[in-house]
Curated annotation (Swiss-Prot):
A GO CC annotation given for this chain: ribonucleoprotein complex
PANTHER family xrefs: 50S RIBOSOMAL PROTEIN L36, CHLOROPLASTIC, LARGE RIBOSOMAL SUBUNIT PROTEIN BL36C
GO BP, one annotated term: translation
Upper lineage: Bacteria, Bacillati, Cyanobacteriota, Cyanophyceae, Oscillatoriophycideae
Species annotation: Trichodesmium erythraeum (strain IMS101)
InterPro entries, per database record: Ribosomal_bL36 (IPR000473), Ribosomal_bL36_sp (IPR035977)
Highest taxon of the lineage: Bacteria
Sorted UniProt keywords: Ribonucleoprotein, Ribosomal protein
Homology family: Belongs to the bacterial ribosomal protein bL36 family.
Molecular function (Gene Ontology), one example: structural constituent of ribosome
Protein name from the UniProt record: Large ribosomal subunit protein bL36
Amino acid sequence: MKVRASVKKICEKCRVIRRRGRVMVICVNPKHKQRQG
């Protein structure tokens, strides 16, 4: 899980979602998981 000020899709499988008011990126590749913070 990467914590970043700006989250972006890294590949075409990445999905930007909102969970509990946080913007997150989920992907089949665990290295692409990101959270805004």
